[in-house]
Amino acid sequence: NTISHLPEGLLSSLNELRSITLSRNNFSAFPSGGPSQFTNVDSINLEHNQIDKIPYGIFSRAKHLTKLNIKENQLTSLPLDVGTWVNMVELNLGTNQLSKLPEDIQCLQNLEVLVLSNNLLRRIPTSIGSLRKLRVLDLEENRLEQLPNEIGFLHELQRLVVQSNQLTCLPRAIGHLSNLIYLSIGENNLAYL
């Protein structure tokens, strides 16, 4: 499609709306209508648009939001209130232009899937170790030179993808990931494990 905006107040008027998919369109910004448009929504898919920012407070009323897919957009940063998205279970921010992941990511205690592939990340904050329910962490194709030791606290982690980065070594703490099923480490600068 080539939709670039929705009629003012459309989403807010749909009181029973639970899931929104507006992928593969021409949105350059979030739909206008403020936080009330997402009050009862549990899943939002805005994949493959041209959105360059997530407005501060846009999910302040989205108490049921558990899945956000904003892959393949133009995001350069996350909003300062990202730490308030406490019910988020799946967060896909792949293929954007993110260069930094805020420390507040640690507040997303229910997060199980975090996709950050194809961004510009040079480091992952140590607070990542607080995401104790995380099962999937996809960091493929970034600019990471190292992973924090705190990654070893992710005892539920089953899938770790760090392929196509600039890693020279892996933290020994990876040995603590007893539930790890899949580890992808190709195309790095590793000399040993």
Language model regions located:
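Compact recognition or signaling/catalytic modules
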Residues: 93, 97, 103, 113-120, ...
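Consensus "Asn ladder" position of solenoid repeat domains
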Residues: 1, 25, 49, 70-73, ...
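Ankyrin-repeat and related helical/solenoid repeat scaffolds used for protein-protein interactions
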Residues: 156, 163-193
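Leucine-rich repeat
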Residues: 12-17, 36-41, 60-65, 83-88, ...
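A generic tandem-repeat structural signature
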Residues: 2-53, 58-63, 67-69, 76-77, ...
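Conserved hydrophobic beta-strand positions in leucine-rich repeat
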Residues: 17-22, 41-46, 65-70, 91-93, ...
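The feature encodes a structural signal of leucine-rich repeats
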Residues: 6-9, 30-33, 54-57, 78-80, ...
